[in-house]
Amino acid sequence: MGFIFSTEKVVYVLLLIFVCLENFGSNAQLLPEDEVQTLRTIFRKLQNQTVNIERTSCSDQNWNFVVESASNSPTSNITCDCTFNASSVCRVTNIQLKSFSLPGIFPPEFGNLTRLREIDLSRNFLNGTIPTTLSQIPLEILSVIGNRLSGPFPPQLGDITTLTDVNLETNLFTGPLPRNLGNLRSLKELLLSANNFTGQIPESLSNLKNLTEFRIDGNSLSGKIPDFIGNWTLLERLDLQGTSMEGPIPPSISNLTNLTELRITDLRGQAAFSFPDLRNLMKMKRLVLRNCLIRGPIPEYIGSMSELKTLDLSSNMLTGVIPDTFRNLDAFNFMFLNNNSLTGPVPQFIINSKENLDLSDNNFTQPPTLSCNQLDVNLISSYPSVTDNSVQWCLREGLPCPEDAKQSSLFINCGGSRLKIGKDTYTDDLNSRGQSTFSSVSERWGYSSSGVWLGKEDAGYLATDRFNLINGSTPEYYKTARLSPQSLKYYGLCLRRGSYKLQLHFAEIMFSNDQTFNSLGRRIFDIYVQGNLLERDFNIAERAGGVGKPFIRQIDGVQVNGSTLEIHLQWTGKGTNVIPTRGVYGPLISAITITPNFKVDTGKPLSNGAVAGIVIAACAVFGLLVLVILRLTGYLGGKEVDENEELRGLDLQTGSFTLKQIKRATNNFDPENKIGEGGFGPVYKGVLADGMTIAVKQLSSKSKQGNREFVTEIGMISALQHPNLVKLYGCCIEGKELLLVYEYLENNSLARALFGTEKQRLHLDWSTRNKICIGIAKGLAYLHEESRLKIVHRDIKATNVLLDLSLNAKISDFGLAKLNDDENTHISTRIAGTIGYMAPEYAMRGYLTDKADVYSFGVVCLEIVSGKSNTNYRPKEEFVYLLDWAYVLQEQGSLLELVDPDLGTSFSKKEAMRMLNIALLCTNPSPTLRPPMSSVVSMLEGKIKVQPPLVKREADPSGSAAMRFKALELLSQDSESQVSTYARNREQDISSSSMDGPWVDSSFSEPGKDVSLQQQEEGRSSSSSRKLLDDLTDVKIE
């Protein structure tokens, strides 16, 4: 019995062990072996060594952890679903591996995890692209923000209809968005910012009616903001910053009643737009419509957005007063209305606010009595008057010096402590404020900072070298910097007038120099100096050749005409804003150096030696002048009979060249070096033995303009010395060769720069156009008023303005210039000029004064702003010239529509309006009402206000002005039909032969033959228009 009992006991124990083992196996919840191998391959390709993959990993959770040591902490979180096969088999459903800086590729083996719903590989260092195998799995969430993934948008993602969240931000993806994205009808979040996507937003995205968040900041998109965004009625956040898209904001945006955050910035367009209708968007918390070409008043209903925390309407064309309803915005923390044209008083509730408000650069008519260093309200340059001394200096336009301007140099250690570098002491700049701040401790300089950090409102405005990038040999000021989320301006104050050398010191110290996600940031911003664009899309690390390396952007010849030098750094929505952390983007600068290009008067008297030197030099110059006069008048050596000898005898303050030199320079007048055909003959490009490039004008033996006229021209030009006139280097007179040697201007003519073929055009930015316009004006002012001889050019047009290597304007072709005597202003026998540029009184009556040049300048000024030719551009059939269209736009209050669309929004609206109004003032039909060129220069430089126009087309009830214009139009048409056939052919010949050089002929009249005479000889069909002109000669336009 004992044995039997023992046997039964053993069997019972064995059965019990078997049941226990079976139960244990069923509760183990193991991963299938094939999934284990897939996961091991994935982790190996990701180069992640922190996780061991076993079949039991879903149970022991050894792969789930967070490192709490830093911001953006490395996070590993892998989730399993163990409900398969009676809860005995597990499948991986979610994989999060964030902030590990994993350096591998995106493994295609992810597509073998058949139950995977989420992949989050944010903030790593992955390269390559997203694998096509993902279309095999029921993926719902994909996030790869902050990597190095590249290539086109993965088209396979459009086939994964289960996707609800896609985040590809801060990578290197390129190309257009695929149309099949519209298949993702379950999509709730589509985040694509900080890539290089191009093209338009596909219309198929109108199907994404479940979207709650769409962000595509900083991509180079094209086309207009699509109207179909109104279909996204569940949308809560829309970000379209810095996309290069065109306005206006579509009316359908009013359908997005669930929006809480709307950010649209830096729109392009040919005209300003009305404020979009947002009256239904009452859930708004953050509203940013910066630099969107919005005009008109701020709507009252904005004050009814009770949850509004941030409002940014800066850099638009807003007018009117700040709505009184804004006093109801109890929730707001930040308001930016700077750089508009707001008027009226600043409301007291604004001044009393304890929040951050930027109202700088406006036109408020009743300035408040505030400190220049007001903590919470920035009102710098918000009052248009410059001279009203009852207003604080910092509130006035241009920040005029409150005392005599005595400063001539400035050194600032931006964001750092006081430093001495060599002989220069850099002042400290340690104010930590920056949301809406103006700070000026010493009234020698100041800064104005504006903006709030995206996603991290408490981020700082001073930067330090957190990654220890700056080595010991680099100047100390590169270890610190000031930065701003939107706009950062530095002002050099109380500077003496004159030319300065400006050095802007940069070093990128907020991104790392290693193979981690901390190195993947891209900081991009624009730089303006004195209101002129200096750098677009400036990237410090790219220009310096890496992070932690210094880069100096030097600008020589910065002109201070008042007493302030302004440096403006502006973020335009491009680059990254989440690397290494949120709040790291926007303009950054390390130091500023300003030194004079002029000798600073120390007040010390001249030494006796210096006085003696000046006296001796003055006597020598006087003696030479007497000899020149005696020689020219024949009292010294007598006048020569031979004309060539007479030319040799001229002392023209120029150099003398031998024919051998000229032949060698031009390769014996090789046709390959011919760059144009002037009124006196061909023009050749040449290179002298010392390497200097010249332009040689050769007097043609066939020219009907004799050597005597050549003498007149060379004598006149040699006496004219001005930076904005083509310079005469010298001449050559040997045998029958009569040659003029001019400076060679590398960038050809203004006409070619503006109207040439795509290959020829220079795509001039706004600051260059403004500089060119001022240069032409200064050159003409010199000819009319400053030179010893009063000279009228008679043929100012874009082809007669040449551009040097630095794109400075120089007036050319004085072959048509005429010495003008006040007693003889009516020239009845010869009209020299170009149709479309000639003043009416000159074209119709032959009446010539310097005001004819003023008229022509006005036309050229319009062309510079618009980028369109006055004679070739016809927006509508009823408008003959660009000028006619400009008059209409002026009456409609839409002059800014004339601005060249190629400029986008990258121009100064204030300067553009100033230039356009000056152009129309210069083209006044009455010559007596046109300003002198010296006044035009002052108006262009902002020294005096632009005079209001005295002639308006609508103020002409009798229609006489329209009749006169019609008569001029008929005459122009007659002239073109009869005269310009020869002229056009000739001009085509010249332009075709002058593409390599700046020299082009400016005259449409046949050499030796007047336009008026040609018309009489070649046809009589103009009689009707002439009779009409005769009937109107006494009509007075008022």
UniProtKB/Swiss-Prot annotation:
Record bears the keyword Repeat: yes
Protein name: Probable LRR receptor-like serine/threonine-protein kinase At1g53430
Highest taxon, organism lineage: Eukaryota
Species: Arabidopsis thaliana
Transmembrane stretches, start-end: 610-630
Extracellular side: 29-609
Residue segments, region Disordered: 984-1038
Domain Protein kinase: from-to ranges: 669-950
Annotated Pfam families: LRR_1, LRR_8, Malectin, PK_Tyr_Ser-Thr
Record: active site: D795
Residues recorded as bearing Phosphoserine in the entry: S828
Family, per entry: Belongs to the protein kinase superfamily. Ser/Thr protein kinase family.
Bias-annotated ranges (Basic and acidic residues): 1027-1038
